[in-house]
A protein has these predicted regions:
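Short alpha-helix boundary/capping segments
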Residues: 23-40
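Short, positively charged and aromatic/hydrophobic N-terminal segments
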Residues: 42-44, 75, 88
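Auxiliary Fe-S-binding modules of radical SAM enzymes
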Residues: 91-154, 220, 352, 358-488
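Canonical Radical SAM [4Fe-4S] cluster-binding loop centered on the CxxxCxxC motif
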Residues: 166-168, 172-211
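Hydrophobic faces of well-ordered beta-strands that scaffold small-molecule active sites
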Residues: 172-178, 227, 258-260, 292-294, ...
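Conserved Radical SAM active-site core
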Residues: 197-335, 340-357
């Protein structure tokens, strides 16, 4: 009687079990299968019987009991579990120590060479996707759905990491930035938002011009290279107020890049000022705006937007506003809010619409997946996203958005620990020091309000990557005491 192999994932180069670089097999003797089946039917499982029947010492067997998965991740139920008559949780408890693993012929496993490593997928749906990734061919909508559906998340991450390293090697970017939110008064009343307040709400605020400038100065202790400015859709503030905020910042901090106003805000300001979007953008440029952030995109699917943000511009107007900005020479980012009421198809649709616009304009620099934080929102009955969902989203984004230079793991939303792991799942950017982030903390985020350059570098280096400080346009930044120079 032959041996039945059990695949065991062995991880190297990444904390814990988040990057399958080597796959080997342990052989298990099926001789005691009948006895195990009988006991399994009665929910009895004797570890001594099992270890003795498989020529594993009792002490060695006990050392193998872990809570990690030891079956091919592409299968909902391990095939070997059925042949041995084991229940799912019993099979999950069996792992062979790495030191005792035997290498066998891997020819039966699908393999693709990536440099000195090999990709092996236990999910057959990933095979054609892997072939496309190797050939640097574009993935389809169906490929995207398969990536979301696959149980072999480690293989999905492996592919995304391959693309990431092909584009950036080990380089991982961060910047020293300061968030400024001039007002939280907003007419949109989005169900996904814990930041906005109605006019007259005691918790609402609007900064005076001097307060906005002082806020910027208070975050200048590390010589920031970027001001990130977003806020609510205030029903009364004139367009001129926002132009004055920008002019004052540019006058006081001429070297700092100003990344200001989402596509939603720009469309709103244009309506308030009775200007076209193009005219609005030109006035913002004249005042000192250098680029735009990517917020407000949420999910483009009309069905979802009608529930979570029905008073915002729709997905098509968001894309059209971005198109106009890019055609005027502005660079911008793009986001997607996930983990609420959307489905995998909505996510794929969102990503492919961004990809199509990037084909046309080339104006996007970075894609930032944003995990929904339900606390303090009308959707607080929804669960928070899991770490597995977060790292899968990073990986799928990297694989589908082949024309986006960068994928950001926004540590404020994902937590620093998950963001660090994401650096092995396709992300090449951690965002920055941030300093006093409000929007996601109002939604219950418990991450720090900011991080130092030293802390960000530690996260990156511990992940086996090389930290590179950048400015907003991804030029390398060199520092000397409290000053900096940008390599353009």
């Amino acid at each position: 009687m032959g041996c039945s192999p059990i695949g065991v994932i062995v991880c190297t180069g990444v904390p814990h079990c988040f990057a399958p670089n080597i796959v080997r097999d342990a052989a298990i003797n099926p001789a005691p299968a009948k006895a195990v089946r009988r006991k399994a039917r009665r929910s009895i499982f004797n570890l001594q019987d099992f270890s003795r029947g498989h020529n594993i010492s009792g002490g060695q067997f006990k050392n193998t009991l872990r809570d990690a998965k030891s079956f091919p991740a592409g299968h909902s139920q391990p095939p070997q579990a059925n042949s041995l008559g084991l229940r799912y949780h019993q099979y999950m408890a069996v792992q062979t120590p790495i030191s005792s693993l035997k290498t066998r012929d891997q020819s039966a496993l699908p393999t693709h060479a990536f440099g000195t490593h090999a990709f092996r997928a236990y999910d057959p749906l990933l095979e054609p996707i892997a072939a496309k990734v190797m050939a640097q061919q574009r993935l389809s909508a169906n490929d995207g759905l398969a990536l979301y559906a696959s149980h072999d998340v480690l293989a999905v991450g492996w592919l995304a990491n391959h693309v990431r390293e092909r584009m950036h090697g080990d380089v991982t970017y961060f910047n020293v930035n300061r968030h400024i939110n001039p007002t939280n008064v907003c007419v949109a009343a989005c169900k996904l938002c814990a930041f906005g307040r109605k006019k007259g709400d005691p918790a609402g605020y609007t900064m005076a011009l001097s307060e906005a400038w002082e806020t910027a100065a208070s975050g200048y202790t590390e010589a920031v290279t970027e001001f990130h400015i977003v806020g609510g859709l205030h029903p009364d503030l004139p367009f001129e107020f926002f132009l004055d905020v920008i002019r004052g910042l540019k006058e006081r901090f001429p070297k700092v890049h100003i990344k200001a106003f989402t596509m939603v805000e720009i469309a709103f300001l244009a309506r308030r000022a009775k200007l076209s979007v193009e005219e609005t953008l030109l006035k913002l440029r004249e005042a000192g705006v250098d680029s735009m952030p990517g917020g407000g995109a949420e999910i483009f699917a009309a069905r979802v937007r009608s529930i979570i943000c029905d008073h915002k511009i729709d997905g098509e107007e968001w894309l059209e506003t971005a198109r106009t900005a890019h055609n005027l020479g502005f660079k911008s980012n793009a986001t997607m809010l996930y983990g609420h009421i959307e489905n995998d198809g909505d996510r794929v649709d969102h990503l492919l619409k961004l990809r199509a616009l990037q084909d046309e304009t080339g104006g996007f620099q970075t894609f930032i997946p944003l995990a929904f934080h339900p606390e303090n929102t009308p959707l607080d009955h929804l669960p928070v996203t899991t770490g597995l969902t977060d790292i899968r989203q990073i990986a799928v984004s990297r694989l589908l958005l082949d024309n986006f230079p960068h994928i950001k793991a926004y540590w404020q939303m994902m937590t620093p620990k998950i963001a660090q792991i994401a650096l092995r799942f396709g992300a090449d950017d951690l965002d920055g020091t941030v300093i006093e982030e409000k929007i996601y903390h109002d939604a219950g985020a418990t991450t720090p309000q900011g991080m130092t350059r030293k802390e960000l570098c530690r996260l990156i280096t511990e992940a086996g990557r090389v930290p590179v400080e950048r400015d907003t346009l991804y030029h390398a930044v060199t520092r000397s005491e409290d000053s900096f120079t940008v390599a353009v």
